[in-house]
């Protein structure tokens, strides 16, 4: 049997690298496929060297920002250069591989890279989108560009703190959405105007295909309605894309994503500290790899943690200044007024292995920005959540967490957009307390943990979906010969 050869192209950001690398491992382990992993040179340099599976090779290219995208860089210039250089690099790879007698079977690409699909079409190479956000978010974008734009814009252009009394319903989705539940790129005040045209380009490309398959980092039981909401698209759940050691245990050595674009804390004593705490007692606080909170918000979080009185592990990344600043790296925790009190009660680290932290029995709650990777990791680990969304898909994820999966409670900011210490403590007390809400979220967290692990078991939904996709690719490949 001829081996599948995949070209997997990923946007160079932490939230894209991690699930796509895990998908590469899944492809290799499921069928013995060969995967060539393509991303920028700056991202590749930060990918760990440990446990690279047989069948995975890297093909990094220069996007013109080999030291990474820095604050102060122009995002439109960056995206333009990434596209121009990426098209050339991937074209060269595809042509060279074909000339050597080892043509690629399929190109798989992540969000924000719709030009990859256009280029693959020109090269007569099948392509498929790896959607690394929930299926619900895909559906919302689809509806935005297919008849619901005015309705959505009308509901996101006014209101106090983006919370409106009115809500909208979208076909096939089980929840109604207010402004704060929708992806932030749709909001009039969204400053990241580069993103929405890329999603529009993506949807237009899919429209040209007949019943295209879209691989989604979710699983059937998690989003049954959203996966089936759009008849003309074949959305299939292939997730959760989480390291095997923390999911199905098939590969105990697979303990990290491998794509950690930030330096992990050199001092792993936080794991020993975690393990010394009583079961279910520790609050873990992390806002991911991109979000930067203002000093006022940081102070309120500190106040809420201190008032709660439970041990906590708080990830505060080193803040990188603009190029040319004398103080390029600043430790934000040093600016907190109550730093000494915080360190008496908890532990502050610049980065950590999140999947390891969440798997610790001492974890009682995860205060999270609700990035999709973090949301899935909390589900897989069975850890209840205080949802503290910031931007992009996170408001939608928080809505699903609180109202659909019911594994957490969402904070409500005040009129200035700040989540007060009192509000954070209120949510922590609900999630960690012995009342009905606390009992419900803990019970639901356990339920989804079991269902997530079941989904990737051999013969279950995500495993079957991936194998069906590979059979589909084989048919396409045979038709080309």
Swiss-Prot record:
Keyword Isomerase: no
Pfam families found in the cross-reference section: UDPGT
Annotated PROSITE patterns: UDPGT
Residue sites binding an anthocyanidin per the record: 16
EC number, as in UniProt: 2.4.1.-, 2.4.1.185
Binding-site residues for UDP-alpha-D-glucose, renumbered to this chain: 354, 369, 372-374, 377, 393-394
UniProt key word Secreted: no
Temperature-related properties: Optimum temperature is 40 degrees Celsius.
Activity across pH: Optimum pH is 9.0.
Entry keyword set: Glycosyltransferase, Transferase
Catalytic machinery residues: 16
Catalyzed reaction equations: phloretin + UDP-alpha-D-glucose = trilobatin + UDP + H(+); (2S)-naringenin + UDP-alpha-D-glucose = (2S)-naringenin 7-O-beta-D-glucoside + UDP + H(+)
UniProt-recorded Gene Ontology molecular function terms: flavanone 7-O-beta-glucosyltransferase activity; quercetin 3-O-glucosyltransferase activity; quercetin 7-O-glucosyltransferase activity; UDP-glycosyltransferase activity
Expressing tissues: Highly expressed in young leaves, at intermediate level in mature leaves and at low levels in flowers and fruits.
Role, per record: Glycosyltransferase that possesses phloretin 4'-O-glycosyltransferase activity. Converts phloretin to trilobatin (phloretin 4'-O-glucoside), a potential antioxidant. Can convert with low efficiency phlorizin and trilobatin to their corresponding di-O-glucosides. Can convert with low efficiency naringenin to naringenin-7-O-glucoside. Can convert with low efficiency quercetin to quercetin-7-O-glucoside.
Sequence similarity: Belongs to the UDP-glycosyltransferase family.
Full protein name: Phloretin 4'-O-glucosyltransferase
Gene responsible for this protein: UGT75L17
